[in-house]
Curated annotation (Swiss-Prot):
Pfam families in the record: Methyltransf_2
Residues involved in substrate binding: T145, D146, H147, V148, A149, P150, C151, A152, M153, H154, W155, P156, D157, F158
Organism: Aspergillus fumigatus (strain ATCC MYA-4609 / CBS 101355 / FGSC A1100 / Af293)
Enzyme's top EC category: transferase
Residues engaged in binding S-adenosyl-L-methionine: G239, G240, D265, D286, L287
Protein name as annotated: O-methyltransferase af390-400
Organism lineage: Eukaryota, Fungi, Dikarya, Ascomycota, Pezizomycotina
Disrupted gene: phenotype observed: Completely abolishes the production of fumagillin.
Keywords, in A-Z order: Methyltransferase, S-adenosyl-L-methionine, Transferase
Amino acid sequence: MADIAEQLIEKLQTLETSIFEGQDATRQKLALAARKLFHTLETKEEKTMRLAIEEPVMFSVLQALIDTGLFEGWAAAGGGERDVTELAKLSKRDVEPELLRHQLRLMAANHIILETANDRYAPTPYALAIGDKSTKVAPALRIRTDHVAPCAMHWPDFLAKTNYRKPRDDKASCYIDTFPEKKSFFERCSANPVHQESFSSFMDVWAKGKRPWPEFYDTQALLDGADLSNGSPFVVDVGGHHGIDLMRVAEKHPDLPAGSLVLEDLPDVVGAVHLTTDKIRTVAHDLFEEGVEQPIKGARAYFMHAVLHDWSDETSVKILRQIAAVMKPGYSKVLINDIVIPSTGASCYQAAMDCLVLQASANERTEAVWSKVIKDAGLKLVKYYPDGRGYESVIEAELP
C-alpha cells in the first residue's frame, strides 16, 4: 500500500493543469475527487485544526498582504523569485521584513505563493492575478471582509435569538442584524463605494468562472422566434449588473440589431458600466420602487442571473409578477439562470451559496420550490436546462 501511495504522490506532483485544456468537465471531476480524497484522509483532529485555526487565519493574513500592496507591487515588477527583503520593498506600504517573513510562510503553505529556498518565494499564477488590477481578484476577495465574514460570525447568535427558525423576512435578516447601519446588503453597497466595489468585483470574477449560458440554452431557437422589427427588444437582462451575460449573447449572435439587448439595473450600477458594443443599451430600473412597472414591454426574453436567489420566495414572486405583467402571451419567455438544488448530493458550491443567501433571508431552491415560485407568479414552468457542471441551470417559464 505504501508503494502505491508513493507512486500516486509522484504522479500528482507532476500534474500540469494544461492537460485539461478544453476539458473543463474532466478537470472539475478530478478536483471533486481530490477534495473527497482529502476529506477521507483528514483525521478529526486535523479537520478541527483546519476549520478553527488554519482557514480563518489564512484569509486574514492574505487580506493584510493585499492591503499592503505586496501582490500589486510584485506583479508590476514582473513577478519572479524574490527574497523577503525585496518583497518588503515591493510593497506599497512600509512593511517590516520580519513581519512579512511570518506571513509569507503561511501563504506558501496554502499554495498562494511558492517557497523556492530559505526566505525566497516565487508567485503562482493566482498570486499574480491578485496583483493584476484588471482581473479584479483582489477587490473580489474583499467581499469576505466587507460582507461575508462578519455576517457568518453573527449567524449562530442570530439563530439563537430567532429561536432557530428559517429566516423569511427580507427586512429582518441576519445580514441586517449584523451591521450597525441596519441596512440590507444592497443598501449597504449603495451607501459605501468600497462595499459596492467588492461586490461588483466578486460578481465579475464569479461570472467569468461560470459556463456561458448561451452554451447550454438554445439562444438561436429563441432568436428564430423573435420579432426584432421597429427596435423590439430581444433579451432584457433584469438586474444584469456588469452586462457579461448579454455580452455572451452578442458574441454568439453578431448580427443582432443595435439596442436589441437591454441591460437593466439600479441607476448607480448601469451608470458605471462600460460597454464595447452598440447591441446593448442600458436602462435604469429599481425592481422595488413603488408604483413603477417594468419599463421594457413585450421582449422576447426576460433574463435574470443569480437575482432571485438574493430574495425570499415571497419577494421573488413579486419580482416575477412584475415581469409577467408586461410579457406578450405566446411569445415572451422568462429565463432564470440560477442554482437548482438537487434532491440529493448537492455540491459544496450549491450548499454554501444556499446558506450564504439564507443569511439575507433568501435561499437557493430545489425543483419543487422553483415550480411553486413560478406558479405563484402566474407563470408556467417549461423546462430546466442544466449547465452540465452541476452549478446552475436556466429555468424557462412563460405565460400559461
